[in-house]
């Protein structure tokens, strides 16, 4: 595994957004929502076509406020495709931020809520010299090594340059700085949150 322990904070071993998603079977075309495990048994969507400069906004309504992110299909088309697909299915609704490290990032998107779940499919990272972890408010994908991106994402609180070319940036915050501040205040050095931090609803405001 290429990730380091969540308790390590040395310069030699920078903390990383950790995802322990299983290398699950991507089969299963039908979505059986009555099945309580439906979020973990989805089929990977086909890559969508995007127009140059197309604006797609991902809105997260949480129990501490709302955030809006401009998605970056020109840089990370598969990640944006997957985000739209999962959002339209209701995948991210009622999912928590299970790991919030003050001075680092907030991580969510695991349907199991423990950092070990995913949508049932995995895909490769998408990297660009134009996308660097150089500021707060970036939306990036957690993983446990190459080819293990899924549904778990994180939002940066600070620049995190050691994550460049290891984690895919697929969006940037355009509103909701106060919500990010609230998330960070409810985090800790260990990643344990002081209260339940819930994504009540995720939606795509402008797409296609």
Annotate each PLM feature.
Residues 3-208:
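Cyclophilin-like peptidyl-prolyl cis-trans isomerases
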């Amino acid at each position: 595994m290429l990730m380091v322990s969540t308790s390590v904070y040395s310069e030699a071993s920078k903390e990383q957004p950790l995802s322990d998603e299983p290398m699950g079977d991507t089969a299963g075309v039908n979505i059986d929502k009555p099945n309580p495990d439906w979020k973990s048994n989805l089929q990977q969507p086909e890559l969508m076509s995007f127009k140059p400069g197309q604006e797609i906004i991902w809105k997260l309504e949480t129990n501490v406020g709302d955030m809006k992110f401009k998605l970056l299909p020109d840089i990370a088309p598969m990640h944006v495709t997957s985000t739209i697909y999962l959002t339209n299915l209701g995948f991210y609704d009622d999912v928590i931020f299970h790991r919030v490290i003050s001075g680092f990032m907030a991580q969510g998107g695991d349907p199991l809520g423990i950092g070990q779940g995913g949508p049932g499919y995995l895909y490769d990272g998408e990297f660009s010299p134009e996308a660097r972890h150089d500021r707060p408010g970036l939306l990036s994908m957690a993983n446990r090594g190459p080819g293990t991106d899924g549904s778990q994402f994180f939002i940066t609180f600070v620049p995190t340059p050691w994550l460049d070319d290891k984690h895919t940036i697929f969006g940037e915050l355009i509103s909701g700085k106060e919500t990010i501040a609230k998330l960070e205040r409810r985090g800790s050095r260990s990643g344990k949150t002081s209260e339940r931090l819930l994504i009540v609803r995720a939606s795509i405001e402008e797409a296609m």
